[in-house]
Every structure is written in structure tokens, then in C-alpha cells.
Amino acid sequence: MTKINKLEYIRNIGICAHIDAGKTTTTERILYYTGKSHKIGEVHEGGATMDWMEQEQERGITITSAATTCRWQDKIINIIDTPGHVDFTIEVERSLRVLDGAVAVFDGVAGVEPQSETVWRQADKYNVPRMCFINKMDRMGADFYRCVEMIKDRLGAKPLVIQLPVGIEENFKGIIDLVKMKAVIWKDESLGAEYFAEDIPADMKYKAEEYRTKLLDMVVELDDHIMEKYLSGEEVTEEEIERLIRNGTISAAFYPVLCGSAFKNKGVQPLLDAVVGFLPSPIDIGIVKGIEVSTGEEKDFPISVTEPFAALAFKIMNDPFVGSLTFIRIYSGKITSGSTVINTVKNKREKIGRMLLMHANNREDVKEASAGDIVALAGLKDTTTGDTLSDIDKQVILERMEFPEPVIELAVEPKSTADQEKMGLALSRLAAEDPSFRVSMDHETGQTVIKGMGELHLEIIIDRMRREFKVEANIGAPQVAYRETITKICEIDYTHKKQSGGAGQFARVKIIFEPLNPGEGFVFESKIVGGAVPKEYIPGIEKGLNNIRETGVIAGYPMIDFKATLVDGAFHDVDSSVLAFEIAAKAAFREGMLKGNPKLLEPIMKVEVITPDEYMGDIIGDLNSRRGQIQSMDPRANAQVVTSNVPLAEMFGYVNTLRSLSQGRAQFSMIFSHYDQVPSQIADVIKAKK
């Protein structure tokens, strides 16, 4: 196979879903049937091939996305297994950035759950074409048709049903292929390796015809010529239908819906056929956005083997045998071990040593990789998640990834002096792997503070510190990551002067501070004209503001959601310096924040509780007592779904309360929504504690 057309044969896909929808099991089966796993790994026995960290095998949830290469028909499939727990959405976000297509796995009983919505929105953000696999069709309460409706209602997506289930719950036997109009039935005794096609059962004929018509009505809209043919009563061929499904999937006109039971080994091979048949190859994606370093211009770069080398680092992992591994997705050109490339974000050269193709937890050395490939590089010195590696002579920076701010923090202290140094190393390694995990020092207390996306996120970090780095630490109680902001516009004119023999210091700045909408962060703009402040001093002003906004004026929390506009200033030929302007900016900030009617902000979480009807009243009462605002209540099967916005500060230990309120029958999920003002009486308590 030549390198050029090799791109047509590659599928870079992610498998993503809500926790417990059966994502890892589905991936396991794919690896089994494509010949990569000789033994099927069961998640609930703690032996799945993709879940390779000890914590994952214990908890039965996937934390880090392992990248795996396998083959089906004549195609190469690179699979990224993504976590479904809400504390790990960063992993999903990273994976989606480098994928060409995705399979969204849904639980046939629960349907579209909160995390499914989050992942779906993330995939929308990166325009990832996807298909839906409704799993667990063998389970009590599984309902394929209700799931399809939920995909429509909850995700606002256009499902294209291309399979129907044959039998339901314990009688689930196989599927009806609506393209070929055949039933596909699995033999139970052969671990799903043997299946055969037969005529559609008589009791399913009418339903199959109905859904076949719906399928044709939807796909022919993509091609006027075939639509005319269809409307005039001519037969649309199987090849034409498959071509239209592929085109519609790639353009996101609709999302093919398949079904099966990965655990019972049914429906996985047709899912693989659909992955290679309908999801895009890198050629279908065609381009990647980036910036040309020499000109600073944003451009579209073609995905091609013949173009100069460009790749995105999307994951860093500590491997017990190889050390630090950097996973890259190559967009163009090729790379060989021993060659030198440049990290264009850090402007540092990197020498390529070992290159590995990964299969969940074992590895294969390769000497060369090219456009479309996902490989792991060992021993890179300066590259972190989101960096671009590029050809030295034709440098580009690919579109960067955005990472969410952490919402929860903990103080950690090493148990002994021997642990002190090891802890520093462990935390810096873990922070390099995970951009949503931050480490800082509290200067007042001298404590090390770790910040993350939720209690489970930080629990796992501490666990890894203990197991992988042998660091024992004392852990403080979780703290909320409060923020501060201003609520009115103010203008500050500040002059910094210092004269005490020798060279003095002089800088004058006039800055307008104004509030922004929630989520807009901090924005700095210079409107200096006519050289009132020379160009070389302006970065000093921005640096000063950026540094000082980390400690707000109410209780010392970082300031967010405001804009600082530099409108005027003055300088002195001898006494002005970058440092003088930095000091002036900091003083102007202090004054401006106090005049801008500052307010304390707290993270508000979107909480979704699924409960049997009889506990509904108690659960709503409890959420209200936690300052929760109920957003909606929806019936789902034999349960109620309560969605509310609740301050994170009120949610610690909620899992135990919910368990006792509902005798363990209700479950909840929580995801960060936005920052909002803290009521004044509560703000006073928080200030007093600081």
C-alpha cells in the first residue's frame, strides 16, 4: 500500500459515553474480534485490556484514554477509549480534538444520561462525525425505540436508524440490517464469533419496512438524482444507500444508530463494518487549521503524507517501563526515529527517540510514522499536552486545545521530609500529564494546594501519588475554588514615582476596568495612540495585571470576568522601565478592584438526580436546603429526573445523604455549570474564615 492512499484506509475513532454505558466492554470486544486480544477482558472482574491503571481496574471505570491500533477488513483502526466519569471530561476533550470520528455508546436501559450530553456537546464543538451504538439490549428494561427518541429530544440530533433489535431483554438474539433487509443472528455458544444472516422474522416485517422507508426518506435528500429515482418508484441500490449514509455521517446530516449487547457478544462485528464503512478517513476531513509561524497567518493545512511534518501532542503518560510517553496525532508529512523536529509552541527542538504503536498495555516499536497515524514518542523533553511538533523548515502551530478551570482544591502535606522532594516531583509529573490538574503554593500557610475537576479526580491523583511515586501525604478537607469579580466600571489614573538617589522609577497608567459576562475570563486591551506609553512597556502592564489578579481584594481569590483597557499614560526617558510600569499596573488594579464594587463568586454545579417517585419530595426538599434551584423534573421509565443548579460548597458529602434519603436507590451526577455571586451573608462568613 503506498503512503498516499494509506490515508484512505485509516480510521481514527473515539468510543465515548456516560459511565457504565459499556464503553470499555465494547472496546474490549472490538479488540477481541479484530484479533488483538486473545482473552476477553471483563470490566467487572477488573481485567479489561484498555483499563490498564491499577485504579481503573479496581474502580471499573476508565480514567486515561489508552490509544490502541487494530485492523478490520483492510482498514487500520486507531481507537481512543475515553473516560465517561464527569471528573474526566478533560480526557474526552483531548481525545476528540485528534479524532476523525466517534462512536457514542448509550445504555439501552438508561438512554441519554447527563455525561452523554456533555460528551455530545464536546464532539459538536470539534465537529466530530459520529454514530450511535445502543448497548445492553439484553438487560431488563432495555428500550431501543425510547433511546432513539431521547437522542432526538435530549441531544437535538437527527438519528438515522440503520438496525433494529431482534428480541429484547433476555430474548435479544440479533439485529435487523435495514440496508440489506436481512436479520443477523448470533450463536450464543461461540462467544459471538459466529453469526448468520436469515430472513427477517415475520413478526418484525412490518416494523422493518416502516424503518427502512424512514431511512430511505432521510438519505435520498442528500442526492437529487437518487431522490428522483426513488420518488419515481425505482429501486435504490445497496451501494447507493451505503454511499449516502457515509456522506451524511461525514457531513453530520444525521447520525447512524446501531444496537447490540457488547457483554453478550452481539452486534460488535456490524458495528466494526459501520465504523470502516461510514466514519471518515483523514482524507475525508481534508484539512487542519493552524498558524504559519513565519507569517503569523491562520491557514488551512492539507492532511497529506507529502506535506511537511506537523503533529499535535494530545496526551502525556508515565509508563512504568519506558518513562514519559507523549501521544501524538500526525496530521501531515512523516517522521522517523532519530530525526529532529521543533516544538513550535515552546520554540524548542526535540529529538525523536523511540516511537511506539500502542495496544492498550503493550507496545510495538516502529521506525517511521506518517499522516493519519497516532503514535507514542518516548523521552521528549519540553513537550506538553496541546503543543505542536513541526518540521523545522516549515513551522506551523496547530489549533490549541482549551482546558477548563479546576473547581475544587485540597491542601496536601508530605508525611515526612523524605516524602517532600518525592511529592514535588510526583505532582509536577502528574500536572504535565493532565492540564485540568493544577498545583500551587499557598504563600500564607506554606501548604501545597492541588486543584481539579471534582472529588474523584483529586482522589485518583492522590492514589497515583501513593502507588506510582510511593509518596505518603496528609490530605486536607476539600475546599471550593472561589473567585472574585467587579460589578461596575471605573477609571483609574495612577502614577508610580520613586526617587531615592541614583536612577528613579516613573510610570503613569490610566486604565478602565469593566465587568464582563460570566465565563469570559480576563481580557487586556491597549488603546494607546501617539506613544503616550512606549510599545515595549505595555507587556509589563499586562504582566503586572495578570500576576496581581491571582489575589483578589475581598478574600484573596483570583479575579475573573473583567476587562482592563489601557487608555493613557506617561513615561520618563531615564526613570521609566518595564518594572516601573508593572508596579503601576498592580497599584491601579488594587484601586480599581476596590472601586468596582467587588463581589465574591462561587462555582455552581448542574446536578441531575435520578430517583424512584416515592423519594422525589425528600430529594427536592434537600436540594432546596442546599441553595439549589430546580431547573426541571422529567419522568423517565419508572423514575423521575430532577435537574438543578446547586453551589459546589453545598454538595460535599451529598452522595451519602442521597443514599440514606433513597435507601440507596437514587443516583446523581454533577458537572460544573458556571460561576455566580455568593449571597452577602454567606460571603461574610467566607471572608471571616480567610
UniProtKB/Swiss-Prot annotation:
Q: Which residues form the tr-type G domain?
A: 8-283
* SUPFAM superfamilies reported in the protein's UniProt record: EF-G C-terminal domain-like, P-loop containing nucleoside triphosphate hydrolases, Ribosomal protein S5 domain 2-like, Translation proteins
Where is the protein found, in the record's own terms?
Cytoplasm
Q: Name one GO molecular function term.
A: GTPase activity
Which keywords belong to this entry?
A: Cytoplasm, Elongation factor, GTP-binding, Nucleotide-binding, Protein biosynthesis
Q: Which residues bind GTP?
A: 17-24, 81-85, 135-138
- Tell me yes or no: is Nucleotide-binding among this UniProt entry's keywords: yes
Q: Name one GO biological process term.
A: ribosome disassembly
* One CC-aspect GO term: cytoplasm
The record's listing under Gene3D superfamilies reads: 3.30.230.10, 3.30.70.240, Elongation Factor G (Translational Gtpase), domain 3, P-loop containing nucleotide triphosphate hydrolases, Translation factors
Residues spanning the membrane: none
Q: Which NCBIfam families does the protein's record reference?
A: EF-G, PRK12740.1-5, small_GTP
Known role = Catalyzes the GTP-dependent ribosomal translocation step during translation elongation. During this step, the ribosome changes from the pre-translocational (PRE) to the post-translocational (POST) state as the newly formed A-site-bound peptidyl-tRNA and P-site-bound deacylated tRNA move to the P and E sites, respectively. Catalyzes the coordinated movement of the two tRNA molecules, the mRNA and conformational changes in the ribosome.
List, alphabetically, the HAMAP family matched.
Answer: EF_G_EF_2_B
PANTHER family to which the protein is assigned, alphabetical: RIBOSOME-RELEASING FACTOR 2, MITOCHONDRIAL, TRANSLATION ELONGATION FACTOR G-RELATED
Give the similarity note: Belongs to the TRAFAC class translation factor GTPase superfamily. Classic translation factor GTPase family. EF-G/EF-2 subfamily.
Q: Can you say what this protein is called? A: Elongation factor G
- Gene from which this protein is expressed: fusA
